[in-house]
Amino acid sequence: MTPPGRLYLLRVCSTPPLLLLGLLLALPLEAQGLRGIGLTPSAAQPAHQQLPTPFTRGTLKPAAHLVGDPSTQDSLRWRANTDRAFLRHGFSLSNNSLLVPTSGLYFVYSQVVFSGRGCFPRATPTPLYLAHEVQLFSPQYPFHVPLLSAQKSVCPGPQGPWVRSVYQGAVFLLTRGDQLSTHTDGISHLLLSPSSVFFGAFAL
């Protein structure tokens, strides 16, 4: 009679290798002597869940809303301390430009409204061109880059009082330290009121 120990060895040796491999894979890692090699819960998460995001749920996101200064003369000036205008969570206003506090996606918007009493001279009116542009100045560029731009024209032709509005808005990937500013043609025709002329941005 074969001793039990020898019989056990014979049975193992006669087992097909593929069956042994399947049994081994079915065992828990601890039973295989591989304690500590298993994936941690964080490592087992999908890769897209581990990407860093600049803003997490509950984080107060940067936002700014500016309105046109009624004392504007040669160029459109912005202010943030009145008429529901504000600077929040990192945004600041310097040299009439918004300073981006954190890198990320931002919705940038602006509106202006132009108005006039009519076309001059009335006999042979000349075209009047109106334009408004939001510009980006960044350490990556040596000059102002247009982000949003729109143009309108009024006249020629006999007409009475007129009003033209321009609204623009889009999403941009901005970098901390970027500066957002505006350029406007037709300053003398701006209808300066908080609900008509404004400029802002907020993080997404």
Swiss-Prot record:
Origin superkingdom: Eukaryota
Signal sequence extent: 1-33
Residues bearing glycans: N95
InterPro entries tied to this protein: TNF, TNF_beta, TNF_CS, TNF_dom, Tumour_necrosis_fac-like_dom
Gene Ontology molecular function terms on file: cytokine activity; tumor necrosis factor receptor binding
GO cellular component labels: extracellular space; membrane
Intrachain S-S bonds: C119-C155
Keyword Zinc annotated: no
Protein location: Secreted; Membrane
Domain THD, residue spans: 62-204
Keyword Glycoprotein: yes
PROSITE patterns from the UniProt entry: THD_1, THD_2
Keywords, in A-Z order: Cytokine, Disulfide bond, Glycoprotein, Membrane, Secreted, Signal
Chief location category: secreted
Biological process annotations from GO: cell surface receptor signaling pathway; defense response to Gram-positive bacterium; humoral immune response; immune response; lymph node development; positive regulation of canonical NF-kappaB signal transduction; positive regulation of chronic inflammatory response to antigenic stimulus; positive regulation of extrinsic apoptotic signaling pathway
Role noted for this protein: Cytokine that in its homotrimeric form binds to TNFRSF1A/TNFR1, TNFRSF1B/TNFBR and TNFRSF14/HVEM. In its heterotrimeric form with LTB binds to TNFRSF3/LTBR. Lymphotoxin is produced by lymphocytes and is cytotoxic for a wide range of tumor cells in vitro and in vivo.
Similarity annotation: Belongs to the tumor necrosis factor family.
Assembly information from the UniProt record: Homotrimer, and heterotrimer of either two LTB and one LTA subunits or (less prevalent) two LTA and one LTB subunits. Interacts with TNFRSF14.
Listed name of the protein: Lymphotoxin-alpha
Species of provenance: Bos taurus (Bovine)
Source lineage: Eukaryota, Metazoa, Chordata, Craniata, Vertebrata
